[in-house]
Amino acid sequence: MLSDTTRKWGYQKMKIDKYSAILGNTVGFHDMSTLTNHRPVASLPFGGKYRLIDFPLSSLANAGIRSVFGIFQQDNISSVFDHIRSGREWGLSTLLSHYYLGIYNTRVESSTVGEEYYDQLLTYLKRSGSNQTVALNCDILVNIDLNQVFHL
């Protein structure tokens, strides 16, 4: 059953718009052990004020993508949660946005992920209702104009 707000604005369950995003942490091994012994790559600081995860989140927010699934490795994930919090800084804390977190368990030295990683991705893709999904990673430092990529 659709709520009055849903009927009024024409939104359906989780189908805010036709674009969604998967935001992931690094899968595999990177020789940055001195930097990542106690935190994932996504929460590494940059410029004294930012974290690496800020860059893909800002690209998504600037493109108006409001359905985001963040999937992260279980090890030391609390620093990512502490930094993202509600997602308010990127417009992901409103009633019309969706931000989900998935956690998978794998050894840092492994270059593969388990079945639970892909199961969570498939579930999100099926439920998102989006026509197109962009996948971004947190180990590349870049600002991308996704409006140009998707021709929004």
Ranges and model annotations:
Residues 2, 6-43, 58, 65:
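N-terminal nucleotide-binding beta1-loop-alpha1 segment
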Residues 20, 68-69, 134:
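A structural signal for isolated positions on well-ordered beta-strands in alpha/beta enzyme cores
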Residues 23-27, 72-73, 136-139:
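Structural motif
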Residues 48, 74-75:
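Short beta->alpha linker loops
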Residues 49-70:
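A short, N-terminal amphipathic alpha-helix
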Residues 77-101:
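Acidic donor-binding segment of Leloir-type glycosyltransferases
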Residues 97-152:
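Conserved beta-loop-beta/alpha segment of the NTase-like Rossmann-fold superfamily
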